[in-house]
């Protein structure tokens, strides 16, 4: 059994990994470089079940979104803060060709 883990990077992925490890009793230390241009700061943890120009559902997107909802709800409870917000997506097509 792993007793200690050291994470390099504490963006969204690092924070979620730390949470999962700590749930399993692993002591975690972290090194992180503060970068305001990192994807964790720029995209703010955005999750979308669709991808690509054709706006198709992501492979296993629904399953992953359900896992994310459960994980974020657990973190919200543990930390006493709000982390999850549902947003609507509006896709504007300039031409009929873009619509198909």
Segment roles from a protein language model:
Residues 46-100:
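Dinucleotide-binding Rossmann-like beta1-alpha1 core, especially the glycine-rich loop
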Residues 22-41:
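Glycine-rich FAD pyrophosphate-binding loop
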Residues 1-13:
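Beta1/beta-strand and adjacent pyrophosphate-binding region of the FAD-binding site
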Residues 10-12, 35, 52:
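Short polar catalytic/cofactor-binding loops
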Residues 9, 32, 93:
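Short beta-strand/turn micro-motifs composed of small residues
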Residues 1-3, 38-39, 43:
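Accessory recognition modules or surfaces
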């Amino acid at each position: 059994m792993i007793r200690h883990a050291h994470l390099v990077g504490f963006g969204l992925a690092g924070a979620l990994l730390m949470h999962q490890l700590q749930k399993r009793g692993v002591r975690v230390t972290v090194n992180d470089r503060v970068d305001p241009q990192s994807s964790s700061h720029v995209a703010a943890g955005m999750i979308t079940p669709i991808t690509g120009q054709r706006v198709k559902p992501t492979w296993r997107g629904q399953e992953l979104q359900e896992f994310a909802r459960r994980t974020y709800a657990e973190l919200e409870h543990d930390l006493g803060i709000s982390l999850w917000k549902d947003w609507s997506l509006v896709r504007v097509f300039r031409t009929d060709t873009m619509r198909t």
